[in-house]
UniProtKB/Swiss-Prot annotation:
Residues 523-632 form the SMC hinge domain. Residues 409-442 are annotated as: Disordered. This is Chromosome partition protein Smc. Pfam families: SMC_hinge, SMC_N. Its main location: cytoplasm. The gene is smc. It comes from Chlorobaculum tepidum (strain ATCC 49652 / DSM 12025 / NBRC 103806 / TLS) (Chlorobium tepidum). Required for chromosome condensation and partitioning. Belongs to the SMC family. Keywords: ATP-binding, Coiled coil, Cytoplasm, DNA-binding, Nucleotide-binding. Residues 419-442 have a biased composition (Basic and acidic residues). Residues 167-322, 358-497, 669-941, 980-1025 form a coiled coil.
Length: 1183
């Protein structure tokens, strides 16, 4: 069985879908830091069900989804799948290839799939539980887990052992069982509370039944009186209603007549209104037509005015254009004359311009020749000046050097003097600080002695306090256990009392006889007179059967009295067992049968009942199971064999068995059990009181211990010591600093004196060189002055020639400018002539168009004038028709006004009639409402219809006295207060509920006992498996450790179990390699700790190997020699376990059969490159 494939998509840096195929043996995953190697390990841990994002190196779970790069967008989900070859059936499934898939979406949704079938996280965890392959098992080992395994905290080591022992399921089951036990205890407490409440309620209901019967009698009398008085009131209201109905009928007739007249007149008015509306419509249409005609007249007038105005404007435009054409023709003639004159003047101006240019060229040539000679003189002068500057620069540098040497000499002399003064000051300060340092040191020693004494006192008090706390906790746990047991006993006693007091499980007749406590005939029911151990109750229940309900009497007289009581009370029949009539002389032979117990021996009973039990249990034997009963039944056909579960078997072929629920007597031995429990409870109460007293004494002792005072004193002294130590350290540092400064000052003074001598030597050397440079500077400066005078004379001649050249250039430019002006004016005249010609031609075209448009407008004006005259005639005719319609409309409007006035008078009369009718109807409604109220009240109270009762009053019926009697009865009824009228039904219901709760309590007590037994069984089984696994791992650990280190090294695994929880153990690793004696394992080197942890892991693999193991850089702290041992260890286990190693070590890589390189060619995106080592080696050999 091995991990064959893993597929990643969108997980952390794996943006693209990646598949990794693994073979058996060793596989390495390599690559530089930060490329995403460990992301592969995180993916395997995540798909195995890891829920803590911090273990996946992420603050929240959604961060494991690829978050995008500069080029790639973030993904919306991630998916990881692993495929496991289940060839050894380690996983509890029928499939040989198991693929587990987990998806996570960015919105928080997630999916789990098992062989591509959706499932739950619990299914995944259950699949890998106790296989060594879970997300927190030892199949994935990181370097930090090595530290955790070696650390003082043993929780991680304990998890490894639990996984190897396969007790994870047991602990989970035990946890569930504990929760069920707590739930059962809470339910039992609730049932006890409810039982007490229900019993109280049943007693109250008995009183309410009697109260309800008395109230029923009062209600019957109330009903008779109330119905009679209601019938009388009904008759009085009917007599008032009859005349009112006649008045309503008369008013309704008058209303109908007025309504008919109003309707007729209203119809005529509506027809007239319709005619008026028709006239209004015609008026509107006529007005609309008249408005349209007037609008047309107005439009035509406006159009005529526009045409005339436009014609006038066009004529003015033609006149203006003719004037412009004449003016522009005159201007064109003037420009043509000017152009001819300018052309004649251009030739002489051109000749003058040529002569001025020749003179300018001659002067320009003379200036160039003179400037060349001056440039040569300037260069020579500049060269001489640079030579003088270099000499001056050398002189200045030399002078600066000498000045610097003199300044340095003065500075060195001052430094020597300051150093001498500083040395004297330091020596004086050190002498003054020595007494203070000695006093501070002595004070520190005294304070430390006092602090040690306080710490010893504090340790003593803390130890005493811890001892008292431990004793208190033990007492609390003991007291809690005692109180819990006390409550449990109390509940069991209450249950026994409930069963005994309610006579559950007894026939009706026996229960009746048991209730007669005073003067009860006989001894009582058999089930109350015997006692049986809990384990034997089922067997004795089956053996005695119905006999448990027999009623025992001493003699026949007691039995006759009991029969007589039953007959009088009609309580049915009862089986009686009369002790005097049982033949006790004949001895019953109870043969001893091997493998069976006599039933009579399992029953505790008074001596006087032994004859009855011998009779009932003769030849009854109890065996372990039904197989034993069958075998013994063949050998002893005369006997009856009963199993411990209550199954009966006889040789005659009869078998009695099945579920025990409802078929057993719940009273069997309850009385004896109650007496026994009461004795235990009394003794336990004394024990609880003693434990409470002891706890109070411990609390008093604990409160008397004042560790805070000692802590405060110690803290105060520690602060003083700290201040003194700081002061001493400061003084010592000042002393060391002073000594160092004195030594440094001596060294610095020696160096300064040597430097001063060197400065003096240098000053003497530079004096001759200074004098030589000053002489050379003076000679060179004289030569420069001569050359400067010659250059100044040449520059004067150059300036005069340049001025003459500038004047000639001005004269040439003036001649050229005159010539250009004449040329420009001639060109402008020609352009003006062309422009004027174009404008004249355009204006002539405009005049032609305007004259054409004037002719067209004349025709439009004539046509518009004719249309306007016709529109005026039509508008006049429409105005006459509108005046006739308005006259007819005013006449009809007057007539309609008169009709509407008559209608208002009639409607006013009709409204008055309706008001009278409404008043009569209100009075009628009030009477009918009172009648209906009487009927509804009677119907609501008594469920009868009032009109169906006789209306006559009985003779001698006094209405006033009856009303007083009615009020008295109602007051009596109110004095009863709240009465449960369904008390009898509720009483029967609550009684049934009480019986049900009693049975439920028994079930809970039984369940609680069974759960405690289950927890004990789980603890026992899991502890056996854990101890067996621990012993095997311990032997393997010692052997592997000796293989990796030295056989003489001291190594062991120690275990310390807890009395409170046997499965919570402390496992300690003892490892002392190469003769070292470390006080704690944390003191070992990194490599030694890593090999020790690996020894423990592989020791566990020898007991329960994981099909695959992922080692994430666990070889990082190992040197080459230890890496060799590590690889050798892996080779031993590779046949049974597949190893996947994340490593940077070359030796580890070389030992693997396959390599997977993880790179990050694109920033933020991991890429996988597979390499087969064997193929690579073959290619290397071939080459």
């Amino acid at each position: 069985m091995y991990l064959s494939k893993i597929e990643l998509f969108g997980f952390k840096s794996f943006a693209h879908r990646v598949r990794i195929h693994f073979d058996k043996g060793l596989t390495a995953i390599v690559g530089p830091n930060g490329c995403g190697k460990t992301n592969v390990v995180d993916a395997i841990r995540w798909v195995l069900g890891e829920q803590k994002s911090m273990l996946l190196r992420s603050p929240k779970m959604e961060n494991i989804i690829f978050n995008g790069t500069k080029r790639l967008k973030p993904l919306s989900f991630t998916e990881v799948s692993i495929t496991i070859e289940n060839t050894r059936n380690i996983l509890p499934t029928e499939y040989t290839e198991v693929t587990v898939t987990r998806r996570l979406y960015r919105n928080g949704d997630s999916d789990y799939l098992l062989n591509m079938v959706p499932c739950r996280l619990k299914d995944i965890l259950d699949l890998f539980a106790d296989t060594g392959m879970g997300s927190d098992a030892y199949s994935v080992i990181e370097l930090k887990m090595i530290e955790e395994i070696i650390s003082n905290k043993s929780e991680e080591r304990l998890k490894l052992f639990e996984e190897a022992a396969g007790i994870t399921r047991y602990k989970q089951r035990r946890k569930q069982t504990f929760r069920q036990l707590e739930s059962a205890s809470r339910d039992l407490a609730r049932v006890d509370d409810v039982l007490a409440e229900v019993e109280k309620k049943v007693r109250n209901l008995r009183l309410q039944v009697r109260k309800a019967e008395r109230l029923k009698e009062i209600r019957e009398e109330l009903r008779t009186l109330d119905l009679t008085l209601s019938a009388i009131s009904m008759d009085e209201h009917l007599q008032k209603l009859r005349p009112l109905l006649d008045s309503i009928a008369a008013e309704e007739r008058q209303c109908h007549e007025l309504a008919a007249t109003i309707a007729k007149l209203d119809s005529a008015h509506q027809e007239s209104e319709l005619r008026q509306l028709e006239l209004e419509r015609k008026l509107a249409d006529a007005q609309k037509e008249l408005n349209a005609s007037n609008q047309l007249v107005h439009t035509l007038e406006k159009q005529l005015l526009q045409h005339k105005e436009k014609q006038k404007n066009l004529l003015q435009t033609i006149e203006r254009l003719n004037y412009s054409i004449a003016d522009k023709g005159r201007k064109r003639l003037e420009q043509e004359a000017l152009s001819k004159e300018l052309s004649e003047k251009q030739t002489p101006l051109q000749e003058v311009c040529t002569a001025q240019l020749a003179e300018f060229e001659r002067l320009k040539k003379q200036e160039v020749e003179l400037n060349s000679a001056l440039d040569a003189s300037r260069q020579a002068l500049q060269s001489e000046r640079r030579a003088v500057a270099e000499l001056q620069k050398s002189l200045n540098a030399l002078n600066l050097t000498r000045q610097s040497l003199r300044t340095r000499k003065e500075h060195l002399e001052g430094s020597v003097n300051r150093l001498d003064q500083r040395k004297r000051d330091l020596e004086r300060s050190m002498e003054q600080a020595e007494p203070e340092r000695r006093r501070t040191s002595e004070a520190i020693e005294e304070k430390k002695i006092a602090l040690d004494e306080l710490k010893k006192e504090e340790e003593r008090l803390v130890a005493l306090k811890a001892s008292i706390t431990e004793q208190s906790e033990k007492k609390k746990e003991e007291l809690l256990s005692l109180k819990s047991e006390h409550n449990h006993l109390n509940n069991r006693i209450a249950l026994c009392n409930s069963i005994l007091e309610k006579f559950e499980g007894l026939p009706e007749g026996v229960a009746f006889l048991e209730k007669q406590r005073a003067g009860k005939p006989g001894l009582g029911c058999l089930s109350d007179l015997i006692s049986v151990r809990e384990n034997d109750k089922k067997a004795i229940n089956a053996a005695l059967g119905e006999s448990l309900g027999y009623y025992l009497c001493r003699n026949l007289e007691e039995a006759r009295l009991a029969v007589s009581s039953l007959a009088k009370a009609d309580k049915g029949k009862v089986h009686f067992l009369i002790l005097d009539l049982i033949d006790g002389g004949a001895k019953i032979d109870y043969a001893e049968i091997e493998g069976a117990r006599r039933a009579i021996d399992l029953v505790e009973t008074p001596a006087e009942l032994s004859k009855a039990l011998n009779l009932l249990l003769q030849h009854c034997y109890v065996v372990a199971d039904l197989d034993a009963a069958e075998q013994l039944g063949k050998k002893h056909p005369e006997a009856l064999f009963i199993t411990e579960k209550g199954e009966k078997f006889t040789r005659r072929g009869m078998l009695y068995g099945g579920s025990a629920k409802g078929g057993e007597s719940v009273r069997l031995g309850k009385k004896a059990e109650r007496d026994r429990l009461q004795k235990q409870m009394a003794g336990m109460a004394e024990t609880i009181a003693e434990a409470e007293n002891a706890l109070a004494v411990l609390r008093k002792e604990f409160s008397a211990i004042d560790t805070e005072r000692v802590k405060r004193a110690a803290a105060s002294i520690s602060q003083e010591i700290s201040a003194l130590e700081k002061r001493l350290a400061r003084l010592e540092a000042e002393e060391r600093s002073g000594a160092d400064q004195i030594a440094h000052a001596d060294r610095e003074r020696t160096a300064l004196i040597a430097s001063m001598q060197s400065v003096l030597d240098e000053l003497e050397k530079t004096q001759p060189e200074t004098l030589r440079i000053e002489a050379e500077i003076e000679t060179a400066q004289q030569k420069v002055n001569v050359m400067q005078e010659e250059l100044s004379a040449g520059e004067s001649r150059s300036r005069a020639l340049h001025a003459e050249l500038q004047a000639q250039q001005g004269r040439y430019r003036d001649a050229q400018l005159d010539l250009e002006k004449h040329r420009f004016r001639a060109s402008a005249c020609q352009q003006t002539i062309v422009t004027l010609s174009d404008e004249i031609e355009g204006m002539q075209h405009q005049i032609a168009r305007a004259e054409k448009e004037v002719a067209e407008l004349g025709q439009s004006i004539a046509q518009a004038t004719a249309e306007h005259e016709q529109a005026v005639v039509v508008s006049a005719r429409q105005q006459e028709a509108l005046n006739e319609l308005e006259s007819s409309y005013r006449d009809l409007q007057t007539k309609n006004h008169d009709t509407l006035s008559n209608l208002r008078d009639l409607r006013r009369k009709h409204d008055l009639s309706q008001q009278m009718l409404a008043e009569f109807n209100n009075r009628k409604a009030k009477l009918e409402q009172e009648i209906a109220h009487l009927q509804a009240t009677v119907m609501e109270r008594y469920g009868v219809e009032l009109e169906m009762m006789p209306a006559h009053v009985p003779e001698g019926f006094d209405v006033a006295a009856s009303r007083e009697r009615l009020a008295y009865l109602q007051k009596q009824k109110e004095q009863f207060g709240g009465v449960n009228e369904l008390a009898l039904e509720e009483y029967e219901s609550e009684k049934e509920r009480l019986d049900f709760l009693t049975a439920q309590k028994e079930d809970l007590v039984s369940a609680e006992k069974q759960l405690r037994e289950t927890i004990e069984e789980i603890n026992r089984t899991a502890l056996e498996k854990f101890r067996e696994t621990f012993n095997q791992v311990r032997k393997n650990f010692i052997r592997i450790f000796h293989d990796l280190f030295d056989p003489e090294d001291e190594v062991d695994l120690l275990i310390t179990t807890s009395d409170e929880d046997p499965l919570e153990a402390h496992i300690q690793i003892v490892a002392k390699p190469r003769g070292k004696k470390p006080l704690a394992i944390e003191q070992l080197s990194g490599g030694e700790k890593a090999l020790t942890a690996l020894s423990l892991l592989f020791a566990i693999y020898l007991v329960k190997p994981s099909p695959f193991c992922i080692l994430d850089e666990v070889d990082a702290p190992l040197d080459d020699a230890n890496v060799g041992r590590f690889i050798k260890l892996l080779k031993k286990f590779e046949n049974n376990t597949q190893f996947i190693i994340v490593t940077h070590n070359k030796k580890s890589m070389a030992s693997c059969q396959a390599l997977y390189g993880v790179t990050m060619e694109e920033e933020g995106v991991s890429k996988l490159i597979p390499v087969k080592i064997e193929n690579a080696r073959s290619e290397e050999t071939a080459s």
